[in-house]
Every structure is written in structure tokens, then in C-alpha cells.
């Protein structure tokens, strides 16, 4: 085949492809302009054996209550963006895609979030994902996940929906702005302090010279010296008082700033404890034995603000005092060894509490 013929065939092929694309685009525009939606299909793409947070029936109800028209509506008149926003505003929905197929079917694909745990603590009723995203437990939902109860206070309000890290960062930013605002309140005080220091320096330089050209006598000169001393003493007292007042106000503002920084540290610590709580839930869920054995996790906030955990096992009638969420794997290993070497021979109903909070020992109480 000659080079000329080959180029000609390639050109014709590309022309045909371009023509098909133009024709297809025109056909799609015609369908969108004249076609109507004849069918609505809703798919929750990641429903699992644990249950579901969102169902097709729920989505149909949302769309109906919002007044968004679907069936019988012209394809190009369907508010796809509105549908996606309507569904996505529910915190338990991760992603939503809505589109109309060539055949006139409105497809809605929904990906729900995968909660790790449900919080039922201190007025809280929310699901939390492994990466720390919080959302309210929806009505008519059915999903089995571990439940944490108790008096524990999470580092976010009960009505919060969203990333806990983002909430903490927002709070930290607000505190940073408050600290900066307090720092700006110091600026006029610093200027007053510098002015007062200059006055004190000027006061030290104040001297009296004998006025020889006026034939000033010793008595007159001594009188002027005494007057200057009295004036300097009065000014010195005034400047020292001002310096004390200014310094006291600066230290007061600095104290407020330090209090705000303590709030920041407390926020960061509470966030760390919260993520550790998720970690212990993951540890239980990832182990076949502990997933079956631990039936309840009770969390509480101590007077010092620390987080402590208590486990309710399936075996026996005792509670496991787990304590702070440090050395989690070591504590579980210690408890498992005690199960095997202690309780299996002593009996599962002998103790009321098993305390594993302390290093290298298990303390039991009847």
C-alpha cells in the first residue's frame, strides 16, 4: 500500500470518527431536549451485612418532600445538582452521583459512610467513622456496630456533624485569633511603658548648675537643689507607680493568653483521647476473640479530664477496669493470659472487678 493511500484511509477514518461524535452528541442533545424520565433507579453501592444507614425508600421520600420532579420530567429539566445536594447534606452519605441514561432512566448512586462505633455518651447519639467523621444516627436505620456508653464527653457538641479534626482545628484557630487579639491589646501598653521608661531616663539626667553669671549665692543654690530633689522624688514615685500599673495590666493580659493556650492543649489532648477510643474499638473489632467477648465499652471522663474505659465481657459477671488508653495491646495480652491461666482454673464467677490498669499485674476484687 502506497504512502498516499495509507494517509487517505487514515484521514477518512478520522473524519468518520469525528462525524460519529458529532452525530452522537446531536442525538444526546435531542434526547435531553425531547425525552422524559421514565424510570428512577436508586442504588446504595456499599450496603453491607452490618446493615444500612440509607435506603432507596428513604431517598425517594427525601426527593418527594423536597418537591424535586423526576418521573415524567424532561431530561434536561431534571435538577441533578439539586438531587445530589439534597442527599449529600445527610452526614451519613459519603458520595452521591445522579445522572440520566440515554434510555431515560434517572440513576442515583449513593455511597454511605462506614461507621466504626456508635456513641451513646453524655447526651450523645451519633455514629463515628474510623477516620473521625461524626454524623447523627438517622431514623429508621439498621446498622450493627459497637456501642460506647458512659459519662465520657467527646471534644465536639452533640449536634455536630463532620470531621472531628476539622472541628478541633476550627476551635484552635478561634483561640489563636483570641490570643492575637489579646496581644494587640498589649501594644498601647508597650508604648506607654516605653514612654514611661524615657521619662525615668530623663529624670535621672536632670541636674542643676550654679548660675555664676547671676552671682547666685550658696543659699539660693541649695534651695533650688532641694526643690529639684523634691520634684524628682515626686516624679519618681509617679513613674514607678505607672510602671507597676502598666506591668500589672500586661501580665493580666499575658495570663489570659496563657489560659487560652491551656485550652488549646486541653483540646488537643481530648482529641488524642477520642482517637485512642476509636483505636481500642478497632482493636476489639479486628480480633475475632475480643469482638465476641467484649459486649460493651463504657467510657468516662475523670475529674482531671482524662479518659478511662471499662469493658463488659460476655464471660463471667465481672467488669474489666481498662483505665487510660495507653499500651492497649499490652493490656489485652495481659488480660488474655489471665483468662487462660487464672480464670479458667479459679472460676468465672469469683470476682466482681478485674483491674488491668497497672503494669505487670492484675488486681481482682470480689
Across the structure, where does each feature detected by a protein language model lie?
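Charged, solvent-exposed interaction patches on well-folded alpha/beta domains
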Residues: 1-46, 52, 63-366
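Short, composition-biased local secondary-structure segments
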Residues: 50-58
